[in-house]
Amino acid sequence: DTIVRIYSMTKAVTTVAAMICYEQGCFQLDDPVARYLPAFADTPVWRGGALDDVESQTSPMTVRHLMTHTSGLTYGFMQTNVVDAAYRAAGIEFPGAGGTLAEWVDRLAALPLICQPGAQWNYSVSSDVLGRLVEVWSGQPLDVFLQANILAPLAMRDTGFHVAPANHGRLAACYAPTSGASMANVGARAKGSATPRPPGLKLQEASAVSRFRAPTTLFSGGGGLTGTITDYGRFCQMLLNRGELDGARILGRKTVEFMRLNQLPDNRDMAAMGQPVWSETSYEGIGFGLGFSVVLDPAAAKAACSAGEYAWGGAASTAFWVDPMEDIGVVFLTQLMPSSTYPIRRELRALVYQGLID
């Protein structure tokens, strides 16, 4: 019953919330985002020079672009260009505890896009903007909508944007590698030395001082949820069941089937859409559906898995995938930052699939 930071595994939950609104007729996937968030109507596009070297959007950012990370938005932690730096300076890197999503989105929309909408795949705060759209479409704060339409119906009792005081003792600490240490060498002895190397991990965030202990008013649809493996397992089982669990219908069967199709232009993989410095998956042979990656070609992806498997992960090395062909869902939770520290996802996938013998 340990509670962990699921970070970007929040994105799939937020996308399901948006698709609930879609089924209710609130929007169409190719609607301009600016129709609902007018601040994005005049958001310029960076041309590659100084921050003010910009041009107008040639076509508008759409809701589909947000769900597929082809919106032109970015993350400040990429640290690859002046737009990333502007995100950090404006406090856009990760929604914090103060203010509201509406205020945060207005600050974001004042900064340039890194490319024309639809032109590139770039990991970004798109799901946070999508969370704000859920608020606009539903007329409810994102936390209230998630609780009423996903968390409560699925009995995800320990999932939310903060950990209740009664559960503070269940919140895990989060760790990171020490500078220069390799996870492969933790506890090993250096050649010619009888002394083990120093531990390869340090405390990244103690549970006693975690920001997730305090309530927030700024609900990050891209990375703000905490929860348990039981809770997220129920969410994945709902997806595997094509929208239903224990009599609770969250989405229609055809909606879930549509979400897990590759939505990138011309059925391209992520490698063909650009390769940013950060992703929760590899690029070759991997497309992107609505809210998660989708395996197009296992050989190109260099993974012993099924075409059609869909997945995502979180910054603290958490991961999930759903394989409709094999009728399995997998959830793995740990607390190790960043997710590139150790190739646990690749090893876990090999362990799971080698166990399928009939």
What are the language-model segments listed below?
Residues 1-6, 26-28, 42-52, 342, ...:
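Short, conserved catalytic-motif segment at the N-terminal edge
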Residues 5-33, 37, 41, 127-135, ...:
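Active-site SXXK
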Residues 43-304:
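Short, surface-exposed loop or secondary-structure junction motifs
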Residues 335-358:
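Generic C-terminus detector
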